[in-house]
Each structure stands twice: as structure tokens, then as C-alpha cells.
């Protein structure tokens, strides 16, 4: 039991450090996206993403705003301003967790 205490302390410290850095990108008002979804000109150097920190205001279309196109009858939170980019019979949905 005594040997697990130092291991627990190291893990706890690492988690606190990671969580303090994890919010840097988001706390600045940006978002984490895969490299393939964030063009070079929208990428930022803030930390906290396992992917890349992206200036979401520079992105356009449903996917660029973090949504996905779904049929009109699908229940979701709709980004109405981006639904036109989905095409006829589709709407832009974001999933709230």
C-alpha cells in the first residue's frame, strides 16, 4: 500500500498538469480539430489539443463549424446558418454532450 502512494501522487500531478494545459486552446475561444479539418491559415499555436488548435471563425460550412449533415427529420441541435452547405433535404447538426 505504501508503494502505491508515490505512484498515485505522480499520476495525480500529471493529470492536474494535463488538465491545466488541456483548456488553453478552448479557453482562448478556439477549438480542437483534426489537421485534415483545419486549413493551415486557421491553425494556432495554443496547446491543449491532441490534434490542432483551430480558429473556428475562419472555417465555413457545416463541417467547418463542427457539425455534420443529417436528414431533416433527424433530432439534433441545428446550426441553421450552416444548413445550406449541406444540400437539399439535409441540415447541419451539432451534438451536445
From Swiss-Prot:
Tell me which positions the record assigns to the signal sequence.
1-22
Q: Which InterPro entries match?
A: Carboxypeptidase_inhibitor_I68 (IPR019509), Myo_ane_neurotoxin_sf (IPR023355)
Q: Which GO terms describe its biological process?
A: acquisition of nutrients from host
One Pfam short name: Inhibitor_I68
**Which UniProt keywords are given for this protein, alphabetically ordered?**
Fibrinolytic toxin, Hemostasis impairing toxin, Metalloenzyme inhibitor, Metalloprotease inhibitor, Protease inhibitor, Secreted, Signal, Toxin
- Source organism, top-level taxon: Eukaryota
Q: What is this protein called?
A: Carboxypeptidase inhibitor
Organism, per UniProt?
A: Rhipicephalus bursa (Tick)
Amino acid at each position: 500500500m505504501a508503494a502505491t502512494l508515490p505512484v498515485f501522487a505522480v499520476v495525480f500531478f500529471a493529470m492536474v498538469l494535463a488538465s491545466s494545459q488541456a483548456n488553453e486552446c478552448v479557453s482562448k475561444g478556439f477549438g480542437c480539430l483534426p489537421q485534415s479539418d483545419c486549413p493551415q491559415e486557421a491553425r494556432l499555436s495554443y496547446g491543449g489539443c491532441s490534434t490542432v488548435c483551430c480558429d473556428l471563425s475562419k472555417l465555413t460550412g457545416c463541417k467547418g463549424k463542427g457539425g455534420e449533415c443529417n436528414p431533416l427529420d433527424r433530432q439534433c441541435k441545428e446550426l441553421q446558418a450552416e444548413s445550406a452547405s449541406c444540400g437539399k433535404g439535409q441540415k447541419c447538426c451539432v451534438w451536445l454532450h
